[in-house]
């Protein structure tokens, strides 16, 4: 039988792109990258990420910035509710968590604009907590590996239970 994990790890080692959010365990930088990359190609997102980090290097800088300035730095990315949610969540982090990004999944999930995927990404990549970061592409690959038809809710639930999600 083919060792799928070893095959994927080898492929990644040969083909990975060097991206700043892969070289950090800073939950703020991971969060910003995850939100920017929603509905955005990596090439375009990288430019916005770098510019955003220069202006808003940490959660306090983002929380304290005027809303119109946050929107200015987001201009051109579209889906402007993402920027409004980032700004609101940054304020929540400062007010409710003393400016420290929450370290547990359920607290991360309470932040405005953060769903299960983004919460899992932050907790997994920043703190190595055991949360599966599963998007549509991962579902498709795993469904093929397990021979599961994901067109129905029942089969999608089967895949989720195999992944312990």
PLM region descriptions:
Residues 2, 6-153, 157:
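Catalytic cores of DNA base-excision repair glycosylases
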Residues 158-165:
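Short "domain-exit" segments at the C-terminal end of structured domains
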